[in-house]
Amino acid sequence: MDCVLRSYLLLAFGFLICLFLFCLVVFIWFVYKQILFRTTAQSNEARHNHSTVV
């Protein structure tokens, strides 16, 4: 019984680790997309301001 319980705990622990890694990857991808979008928006805005000044 102890061996079965240990295998179940190991399976649950592995599932939690996979879930945590998946959430981490999604969070990093979301933050990277936000930063990328913000930098492109700033560059477009700077280019627009530069064209209006000239």
From Swiss-Prot:
The chain crosses the membrane at residues 11-31. GO terms for biological process: transport of virus in host, cell to cell. Changing residue 54 to A: Reduces virus ability to move from cell to cell. Residues 1-10 are lumenal. Keywords: Disulfide bond, Host endoplasmic reticulum, Host membrane, Membrane, Transmembrane, Transmembrane helix, Transport, Viral movement protein. Changing residue 2 to A: Strong reduction of virus ability to move from cell to cell. GO terms for cellular component: host cell rough endoplasmic reticulum membrane; membrane. Residues 32-54 are cytoplasmic. It is a single-pass type III membrane protein. It is found in: Host rough endoplasmic reticulum membrane. Its main location: host cell. It holds the Pfam family MP_p6. Changing residue 45 to A: Reduces virus ability to move from cell to cell. Homodimer; disulfide-linked. This is Movement protein p6.
